[in-house]
Amino acid sequence: MSPGLLLLGSAVLLAFGLCCTFVHRARSRYEHIPGPPRPSFLLGHLPYFWKKDEDCGRVLQDVFLDWAKKYGPVVRVNVFYKTSVIVTSPESVKKFLMSTKYNKDSKMYRALQTVFGERLFGQGLVSECDYGRWYKQRKVMDLAFSRSSLVSLMETFNEKAEQLVEILEAKADGQTPVSMQDMLTCATIDILAKAAFGMETSMLLGAQKPLSQAVKVMLEGISASRNTLAKFMPGKRKQLREIRESIRLLRQVGKDWVQRRREALKRGEDMPADILTQILKAEEGAQDDEVLLDNFVTFFIAGHETSANHLAFTVMELSRQPEIVARLQAEVDEVVGSKRHLDYEDLGRLQYLSQVLKESLRLYPPAWGTFRLLEEETLIDGVRVPGNTPLLFSTYVMGRMDTYFEDPLTFNPDRFGPGAPKPRFTYFPFSLGHRSCIGQQFAQMEVKVVMAKLLQRIEFRLVPGQRFGLQEQATLKPLDPVLCTLRPRGWQPAPPPPPC
């Protein structure tokens, strides 16, 4: 062997040895914490993530659920040299999510801030981890979600939900398969665009196809970015280019809409105190529009994607729950009757529908959970956890544990009935505390109006072969597109022709 090759081999071995030593030392602080065996020294638990059987509808949260059941309320997760801790006790959820002392972990939110080199959510309301900067934004944004502002949005909720139902009625022949996931996504984008930004996207009418495709590709990109090696793989170049172009298109749409609003304000036109107005106020005096666009993207994506998936999961589950559907239809008939416009007061009277939507979020939360950074060593449920550790809190995991919910995989809306005990710090589909979702009341009103109108006038049946699993992109969504055949309420088959 030549001296050069020998020197190169020695350098590689030395680098590998140093790498192994670094990984070992980084993990040694956590070895006392319960957790599954590592299938790979360098990769840690990463191979488990790859074997989660997503084709069968299992997602990463199902892996974490298995570990929480087996190893207890504090579980160690190793990926390369990094360690996170899954926490699944109500006491710890209360302690860490309800206190302003514990911030989001910036390392865990980088995948949302920038995707393959393109700024996506940046320093928007969801991904901003500095409490001071976040609080400044949140204080201004809260004005767009006051009770009076939300009540004023009922007109938009009704208008777009009515348009959705009319389109579905035209397809309700009992035979034509309809992707409810796609239709509900179009509806929630149209609602969000008008309610939050004063814009008509007309997705339900087939307009804005480039924007619709860009949103789809961008969401796939967030999922793809979790593969740290993707940007180095030649076969991924086309996909990465499309992801970057989609993000640029989405931010350009934001620039255009912001410019239109600014021009309208200069002309002295009256503008609603909507989300776009508050975004402009929050960044008044800023040197550039980057953070403003961060919040545009944040509200545009988070404001429609989670609601669309919540509705799609609910339709999917109700397709196999005829008794629950009958109760829902009876309630809608009593509260809403035949009127086409739901009033704000109607929403509070749709008690059973509220229970169904809550139970849907328990089993199928689009936003599965959140992270907090533990800055100092702390005893958590009797386990010493070192400082500078990301803590993972999952409403998906806790919502499916029989420790907290009886028969957790059974869809039972009566868990949330008036006389039922309230789940305390085991159910948090909108997170908890000061970092809870700013738009949760908006979302709950929106999905209630849409579901009430669907139940009032449409019967849906899942096409055979559709699976009840999940997939993970930026959020959790149904594995299949929730293909349904539709019929108008009260539809009866035509009588057979008389015999000749």
From Swiss-Prot:
Per UniProt, what is one GO molecular function of this protein?
A: heme binding
**Recorded metabolic or biological pathway in which this protein acts:** Steroid metabolism; cholesterol degradation; Lipid metabolism; C21-steroid hormone metabolism
The record's section on Pfam families has:
p450 (PF00067)
Localization terms from the record: Endoplasmic reticulum membrane; Microsome membrane; Postsynapse; Presynapse
Binding positions for heme per the UniProt entry: 437
Q: Where are the transmembrane segments?
A: 3-23
Tissues and organs where the protein is expressed, per its UniProt entry: Expressed in high level in the pyramidal cells of the hippocampus, Purkinje cells of the cerebellum, and neuronal cell bodies in layers II/III, V, and VI of the cortex. Expressed in hippocampal and cerebellar interneurons, in retinal ganglion cells, and in a subset of retinal cells localized to the inner nuclear layer (at protein level).
EC number(s)? 1.14.14.25
* Subcellular location, principal: endoplasmic reticulum
- Requisite cofactors: heme
Biological process (GO) annotations held by this record are:
cholesterol catabolic process; progesterone metabolic process; protein localization to membrane raft; regulation of long-term synaptic potentiation; xenobiotic metabolic process
Q: What keywords were assigned to this record?
A: Cell projection, Cholesterol metabolism, Endoplasmic reticulum, Heme, Iron, Lipid metabolism, Membrane, Metal-binding, Microsome, Monooxygenase, Oxidoreductase, Steroid metabolism, Sterol metabolism, Synapse, Transmembrane, Transmembrane helix
A Gene Ontology cellular component where this protein is annotated is: dendrite
Result of knocking out the encoding gene: Mutant mice are deficient in spatial, associative and motor learning.
The record's section on Gene3D superfamilies has:
Cytochrome P450
Q: Respond yes or no to whether keyword tRNA processing is given for this record.
A: no
Q: Which domain of life is it from?
A: Eukaryota
Quickly give the catalysed reaction: cholesterol + reduced [NADPH--hemoprotein reductase] + O2 = (24S)-hydroxycholesterol + oxidized [NADPH--hemoprotein reductase] + H2O + H(+); cholestanol + reduced [NADPH--hemoprotein reductase] + O2 = (24S)-hydroxycholestanol + oxidized [NADPH--hemoprotein reductase] + H2O + H(+); 7-dehydrocholesterol + reduced [NADPH--hemoprotein reductase] + O2 = cholesta-5,7-dien-3beta,24S-diol + oxidized [NADPH--hemoprotein reductase] + H2O + H(+); 7-dehydrocholesterol + reduced [NADPH--hemoprotein reductase] + O2 = cholesta-5,7-dien-3beta,25-diol + oxidized [NADPH--hemoprotein reductase] + H2O + H(+)
**Keyword Iron tagged:** yes
Primary role: P450 monooxygenase that plays a major role in cholesterol homeostasis in the brain. By promoting constant cholesterol elimination in neurons, may activate the mevalonate pathway and coordinate the synthesis of new cholesterol and nonsterol isoprenoids involved in synaptic activity and learning.
This chain's protein is named Cholesterol 24-hydroxylase
Q: Which organism is it from?
A: Mus musculus
Q: Which gene encodes it?
A: Cyp46a1
